[in-house]
């Protein structure tokens, strides 16, 4: 007689288990839905940060589940598949950290560890403020605006400033490149003639190099002074 215990659940046990934990499952799925649907930097920074934390947790969770699958494979084919998937998850996770650290060394912004993209925009205002923002890709044109004394770029709130605080050049950094954008057009004022209420600027991609933001100087001052 075998002493092994059958740990599989039949249909009735599965139904009872679901009934017991359905409230937790509902709350968890609702949490994920809200995070994934409303987690954008242009909507709510708080929810967006929660979304980033959830995405960060997925990779270690995938690796842990993959290791468990390797330890307790259903059969030989399942073991091979589990090993392949676990190795892929580990390589992807390591690759993410390598690229994020390279980007952080280039722009010194915590947005470098954003799992949704590998690019960070940087604006050094002439008053000494440094504004970094998440950006999904490297565009050909950037159009920051100032509305009621607040600077926005890519729909994200950055800082309070005046129109004359915008620099001649702004940057978008990737792990291996620094993209330089030069101001080609600006409009300051509105129909009421109040120049402090609204201003829009157009920056076109000017050049690409491999420098870091630390090498940029504006008016003789380092970016980080």
Swiss-Prot record:
InterPro entries: GAMMA_CORONA_M, M_CoV. It is found in: Virion membrane; Host Golgi apparatus membrane. It is a multi-pass membrane protein. Residues 1-20, 73-77 are virion surface. It comes from the Viruses. Residues 42-51, 99-225 are intravirion. One of its GO terms (molecular function) is structural constituent of virion. The keyword DNA-binding does not apply. Pfam families: CoV_M (PF01635). GO terms for cellular component: host cell Golgi membrane; membrane; viral envelope; virion membrane. The keyword Magnesium does not apply. Keywords: Glycoprotein, Host Golgi apparatus, Host membrane, Membrane, Transmembrane, Transmembrane helix, Viral envelope protein, Viral matrix protein, Virion. The chain crosses the membrane at residues 21-41, 52-72, 78-98. HAMAP family: GAMMA_CORONA_M (MF_04203). Component of the viral envelope that plays a central role in virus morphogenesis and assembly via its interactions with other viral proteins. Homomultimer. Interacts with envelope E protein in the budding compartment of the host cell, which is located between endoplasmic reticulum and the Golgi complex. Forms a complex with HE and S proteins. Interacts with nucleocapsid N protein. This interaction probably participates in RNA packaging into the virus. Belongs to the gammacoronaviruses M protein family. This is Membrane protein. The gene is M.
